[in-house]
Amino acid sequence: MKIDITSVNGETAGSIDLDDAIFGLEPRVDLIARMIRYQLAKRRAGTHQSLGRADIHRTGKKMYKQKGTGSARHGSARAPQFRGGGKAFGPVARSHEHDLPKKIRALALKHALSAKAKDGGIIIWNDAKIPEAKTKGLKANFEKIGLTNALIIDGAELETNFSLAARNIPQIDVLPVQGINVYDIVRRDKLVLTTAAINALEARFK
């Protein structure tokens, strides 16, 4: 797949051939969905907790005698049916993380990249560098080239001026290539890759 290379300012800077084994697959939505579910499950804090019957600080003495009152039989006031009693089958603090094979995770990333390429949502930059760390100027530049909702992936190390200028722009995410992930690719309209990121991805999946 051949695609044009542009600069941060939108000027043409050549073209590049993208590897079809990474960017030319027929996207499988099921793999992408599994990977997103895996990512979001890992992010959950899992700190939800309610008081169960055993956690309630209340006397365990029988409420009233078994027979002779005309009322239903009851033992502990900690039971769920009483006001102030414990929650039956309530949430407990736990990890929501689940396993997903490494090969499936790698394949899901390829399919997410292929889906973005198929939709015409990939932009290739020669680099992500600017002379000074000015958010106002970078935001105006993005608006000029129509980049309002994007994930920008650079090489192994981000250029300091660019990352500082971009980090306060809404709906613009900047990550090094090792941080590329399916969820962030899908949640943004455009995926911007520098040539350094392309080379790193092709080396990673070789």
Curated annotation (Swiss-Prot):
Q: Which GO terms describe its molecular function?
A: rRNA binding; structural constituent of ribosome
- Which example biological process does GO assign this protein? translation
Q: What keywords would UniProt list here?
A: Ribonucleoprotein, Ribosomal protein, RNA-binding, rRNA-binding
Cellular component terms, GO, for this chain's entry? ribonucleoprotein complex; ribosome
Q: Which Gene3D superfamilies match?
A: 3.40.1370.10
Report residue spans for region: Disordered: 63-85
Q: Which residues form a coiled coil?
A: none
The domain of life is: Bacteria
Q: What quaternary structure, including any partners, is listed in this protein's UniProt entry? A: Part of the 50S ribosomal subunit.
Q: Which family does it belong to?
A: Belongs to the universal ribosomal protein uL4 family.
What is this protein for, i.e. what is its function? One of the primary rRNA binding proteins, this protein initially binds near the 5'-end of the 23S rRNA. It is important during the early stages of 50S assembly. It makes multiple contacts with different domains of the 23S rRNA in the assembled 50S subunit and ribosome.
What's this protein's name? Large ribosomal subunit protein uL4
Species the sequence originates in: Beijerinckia indica subsp. indica (strain ATCC 9039 / DSM 1715 / NCIMB 8712)
